[in-house]
Structure formats: C-alpha cells, structure tokens
Amino acid sequence: MPVKYGVPSDPDYNERLAEFEARIHRGEKIEPGDWMPEEYRRQLIRMISQHAHSEVVGMLPEGAWITRAPTLKRKMILVAKVQDEAGHGQYLYHAAETLGISREAMLEALLSGKAKYSSIFNYPTLTWADIGTIGWLVDGAAIKNQTMLAQCSYGPYSRAMVRICAEETFHHKQ
C-alpha cells in the first residue's frame, strides 16, 4: 500500500498530525512507510538532497589535489577521503529516495540550479594549505552539524548520519 502524505485538506489530517508530532516528541523515528505531513516530506527532501549534493560536490576540491599531494601518505588519505565523500552522497541520495523522489530528479534539480549545495565548495583550493583548511575547519564544522542530524526524527537520514559521522570523525583525525 503506497504511503499517503498528509495534506491539510485530508479529513483526518489534524488527528494524524497530532499523533505524528507525539511520536516525534516521544523520540520515535519516522520510517518511510509511516504517515507524514507533506511539508515534512518536502523539507526532508530539500535538506537531504542538499546535503547529498554537498557531499558529492565537496569531494571535487580535494579530488583535484590527489595527484599534487606532497607525499604518498597524503595522496592515500585524500583518495580514501574522496571515496568516502562519494559514499556519503550515495547514502544520502538513498535516504531521500525513500521519500519518493528519484535520484535523477535530485540531480536534475542540482544541475538546473533549483537545488543547492554548500557554497564553501565554490572557493578555489589553490594551495595545499587550502586543502588543510578544508580538512580542519570545514570538516570540523560538518562533524558538529552532522552529529546533531544523527538524532533527527527521520529514520533513514538518522541512520545514514550515524555512519557518516563515524567516517567524518576518522578523517578529521588524519
């Protein structure tokens, strides 16, 4: 049975909304087959797809430095980090797909400019120090933000964030 997303014109909307909010208040996770307000679903798609886009676009500046990293060890660290960032994007695209949007639609929205990604990745990484700054400041801030997201109310996003946070913390230590 397909999930029905709640819209205010539904006759039982207010009752379902009250139960939905009570579940969140109790700390329960909302799962893909559960009833949810349409606005909640739309905001999750916007937020998760932006996060996924940021992971994928975010690997580009570091990926460009793989061949120019100063040591073999640093090259290996960058390769692993870029690979993980691509994986993070995939986890997040999958979480968004559970809300009924296709990966193709998300990528089309990104390429058309309708969807966004973190603008920090628009700045050039002209030196190896720029890569260090990304690793220290940008990844450090992301870990703080993403740790909170691991506690979010939507189960697939929360579980993806638990895994992503563990990997991000590992990279931050390198």
Task: Name each model-derived stretch.
Residues 1-50:
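Non-cleavable N-terminal signal-anchor transmembrane helices
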Residues 35-40, 58-80, 142-158:
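Helix-loop segments that flank and shape redox-cofactor active sites
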Residues 120-173:
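Internal, conserved structured core segments that host functional sites
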Residues 40-51, 69-88, 131, 156-170:
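Alpha-helical scaffold segments that form or flank carboxylate-/histidine-based iron centers
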Residues 29-49, 109-135, 152:
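Acidic/His metal-coordination segments adjacent to aromatic residues that form catalytic metal sites
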Residues 2-20, 81-109:
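Conserved alpha-helical segments that form or flank metal/cofactor-binding pockets of metalloenzymes
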Residues 67-70, 86-90, 97-101, 147-154, ...:
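Hydrophobic/aromatic-lined pockets within catalytic cores
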Residues 26, 54-62, 88, 138-145, ...:
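Amphipathic, well-ordered alpha-helical segments in soluble domains
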